[in-house]
Amino acid sequence: MSSSSKDSSFQVETPVQNILETSTNSELQDQVSSPYEPDYNSPVKQAAASISALQTQDDTLFNNVDERTLENKDGNKSDDANFDQVSGIPSGSLEIPILNSATSNIRLTPSDTYNNIPVSDTNNEEISKNIYGAPILESTSSDFQSKDSLSTTQPSVSGGNGSTSQSPPSLDVEQNKPFSISNEPVEQETENSSTKDLQVYDFQTASEHLPEQSLQNTTYYDPSKTYSSVNFEEIEYGKSHEKLDLPYRTTDFIPYSKDLSTSPEAHRTSIYSYSANLPNYYNEHNELHEHHNPQTPSSPESAYSPENLQLNHEAQNVEYLGNNAAEKSLQMNLEDEQRFQQFLKDEESIMSNWYPGQFPSASRLFLGHLNTKSLSKRNLWKVFKIYGPLAQIVLKANYGFVQFFTNEDCARALNAEQGNFVRGQKLHLEISKIQKKYQNQIENMKKGSHVTKSNQYSEMIGNLPYPTSSRKRTRSPLMSKGKSYDRKGSISMSKNFSPDCEILVTEDCPKEFVWGVEKVFQERRLNIHTTCLYRDSNLQVIIKSCIINSVKSIILINAGLAHLGKVSVQVFKDGSSDSEVRCDEYAAVDVMVAASIVHHAKTSLMHSAASSTPSYNGERIVPDVPSPCISTNPNLPALVGSLDSVNLHHLLGFIQNTYSTTSYIPTRVSFNPNDTGGSFGTITSQSQFVVNEMPKNYARDNYEALHSQESRQRSSVAGNKQLQKILEQLAELKQPDF
C-alpha cells in the first residue's frame, strides 16, 4: 500500500479504520468493556499498540498522525510505508519500550501536547485518569527512546515482505500475557485532531525490573552506538544487582514467586560484616590493632550482638590495656623486673620462717572475685608496690591476699585501689581477718602474758628460768649501755668497752627468746651487747664495725631461728696478715652450744702467746693454741719413772698427737678494713647469717669435747708447772735403750 504524492502524507488511521469497520459493534464493546480479560489476538489491540509506539517516539505525543513519516530500515524517509496485510502493522523494525508497571502515571514534558493543549497548561491529574480504574504506568519522557537507542534485548515487532509480525512478548512468567492496551474507537483524523484518551496500563501487580529502570536520570543517546550510554555515577545503589557486580545476590527486587519449595535468599542488609564489628581497641603505642578496619567503624549495636560475642572474646585475649589510665602502668621496665625478682626471693625467705603474729593484725589485704587465669602475681605486685613494701602475694582459685608490713600501708592501698580495674577485673578489697587458731597466741602476746612463751622458750634454751624482773622491764632489752646504734648500721663504742659477744636481733624477733639468750650468756660471764637490726640496716657495715672494735664473736637471731630455738654464731680470729680475718661460723646451733663456743674463743685469746702480731687498735691477738691437759695427781712423776722406755715412748707420742689435733677446721676469709662494703655474706631480717658456713651438726657433735676442755682449763698454774717437768723427763727418755 502506498500514497499518491509526497504532500499527502501517510495516514495511520486508514488500516485501523478498516479493521474497526469489519468488527461488529458488539465485539468491540466486549473487548472494550472487559479490560481484565482482553483479546490479545485482536487486530484492534495490535493496531493500537502500533499507534502507541509511533506516538511515543522521540519523546513526543503527536497532534497529527497523518503528518508523521516513518523511517525504514535504511533510515530514509518515505511517503509510502509497507504494512502487513493481515495485521495492519507497518513493516520494519519497531521496538516497544517496556514501562515500569510498579509506579504510577505517564508524565509529559512541557513541549508535549494533550488534546491540542500544551502540557504546561494542562493538569497532569486529568491525563493520569484511567477510564477503567486500572493502575497507570509512570515514566518520564526520557523513557521513550528512539528505535536506534532502544536496547536490543527489548521485544520487537518486525515484519517485511509480507511476513506476519511477532506479537508483543510476555513479561509475566506465570500468565504469559503481554501488556494490555486499551483505546476508544479511532475517529477520522483531521489536521487539528489527535489521538484521544490513549492509555497504556498493565494488569499484572508484579513484574521484573529491567536494568534501565534503575536510572534516576535521563540515559544519553549516542548515535554511534547501538546501546544506551549509562552514567554509572547517577545509579541509585541497590536498585539492581544486574548493573552492579556484587559478590552476592540480593532479594531486594527479585519478583515474588509462588513456589514454596524455593529456598529464601540472603538479604543484603542481613549479611554480617565481621570487619565492621570488631572492637576498637588500641595498643600501648596508641595504634589500632591489626584486626580493626578503620574504614568500617564498629557500631554499638553490632559490638554486643550475640553473633559477635565469641569474636569479641577472642579479640580481648590479647594483652589488655583498657581505657583506664591505671592499667597502662602494668608495663614493667628492667628496674621493675629486677625488683620483682628480689621480692620473690624475700617472700620465700619470709614464708620459710613465718610464725603466728609475725605481722600486724590489719596488714593483710583480701582480694575477692578474681579470675586468676588472666591475673598474675606480677600484676598485683606492680599495682600495690607503690603503697609500701610487700611481704607476700598469694593467688588462689577465686581470691588472693597481699601482705604488707604495716597497717598504714595496707589501709592506704585499700582506700586507693577499691573498685579499680586490673586487666579488666574490678578489685573487691577487704582487710583480712586473723584465723581463730592463731588468735589466742597473738592475744596473749599483746597482753604481755609470757607464761606460754616463757615455758616454750625455756624448753628450747635448756629449761633455764627467766628472771622475774624481765616481766617488769619497761625498757627494751635490745639496747644496752656502752655504745649507741645508728639505723644506718654504724656502731660507736667507748674505748674502755669491748664486748665479748655482739648479739644482732631482727625487729620481728620475739623478745622472750632474746631475754633467754642473754641470760645464758651472762651466766657464762660473757660481756654481751644487743643490737636491733631494722629493715634498712646495712649488715656488712655493722660486721666491719664489730671487727674494728675488737669484738670476738657475733650472735645472730631472727624470727625463723627463734621459732626453732636456734641461733647462728660467728667467731673472728686473726689471719696470716693484717688484711685477713678468719671467720668460723656455726649456723643454727642451740643456745647452750653457742655460749660454749663464744666462751672457748674468749679463753683461747687469753692464753695465747704474747708475741703474736698486733691486729687492730694496737691490741695483740694471740694464736689459737689449745690448752694442754692438766693433771692433778701429785704422784705422776713417780708413775712415769716406773715405766720402761717402750711404754714411755708410746705415752709421749699419744700426748703429742692429742695436743696437735684440733676440734675443727678453721676457714679464712679475706677482709680489707678499708673496704666499706666488706667481704662477708649479707643477711636481711628474714635470712640466715651465712659466711663460710660450717656443718650444722658440727658444734652439737663436739659439745661434750668442748665442755671437757673448758673444765680442764680451769686448773691452777701449779699443775701446768708440774706438767712441764714431766714433759722434760719424757724428752730425756724419748730414745729407748735396746
From Swiss-Prot:
Alphabetized SMART domains for the sequence: RRM
Domain RRM: 363-434
A matching Pfam family: RRM_1
Family annotation (InterPro entries): Nab3_RRM, Nucleotide-bd_a/b_plait_sf, RBD_domain_sf, RRM_dom, RRM_HNRPC/RALY_subfam
Keyword RNA-binding annotated: yes
Keyword Ribosomal protein in record: no
Stretches for region Disordered: 1-51, 140-197, 466-487
Domain of life: Eukaryota
PROSITE patterns the UniProt entry points to: RRM
Transmembrane segment boundaries: none
This protein's name: Uncharacterized RNA-binding protein C3H8.09c
Keywords: RNA-binding
Compositionally biased spans, kind Polar residues: 1-34, 140-169, 177-197
GO molecular function annotation: poly(A) binding
SUPFAM superfamilies to which the protein is assigned, alphabetical: RNA-binding domain, RBD
GO cellular component: Mei2 nuclear dot complex; nucleus
